[in-house]
Amino acid sequence: MSHPRPRVLSIDDNKMLNLMRQKVLGISGFDCDLAYTAEQALAMVITSHYDAILLDYYLPGTTGLSVAQTVKTIRPGPPVILVTGEELLERSNAIHSYIVKGDGPEILLDKLKAAIGQRREMKSMQAAASW
């Protein structure tokens, strides 16, 4: 069964990084929406469906962990991948995985594909169990 292009929300206050991420994802077969603030991202999560969310750890006035927890209360389905400048010591159930800024695009793509694949597999198993 063919799936449509996965839809990703990338949240980062660094516009250049966010635009570069969108370009890499677009070339790699993803549709990517951009948000630059927590407020903008939460509004987009409420109104749109995403297969995964990329989330910068540091956002103006808040942290990615806080935003991830709010996202999970609004829409618990999409896996959240935290993008951080250093190895993450703090853990949260709201985070599927994380990548370190500076890791190559192949790591980002591998983590995104794995997270989306796991989510789709779980949804298929839930659908089969409901028969």
Which stretches of residues belong to each language-model region?
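Non-catalytic signal-transmission and effector/linker regions of two-component phosphorelay proteins
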Residues: 1-7, 106-131
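Active-site residues of response regulator receiver
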Residues: 56
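Two-component/phosphorelay signaling modules centered on CheY-like receiver
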Residues: 15-33
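Acidic catalytic/metal-coordinating carboxylates
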Residues: 37, 63-66
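The feature encodes the CheY-like receiver
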Residues: 60
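Short amphipathic alpha-helix used as the core "switch/output" element in two-component signaling
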Residues: 43, 65-76
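Acidic, metal-coordinating helix/loop segments flanking the phosphotransfer/catalytic sites
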Residues: 34-52
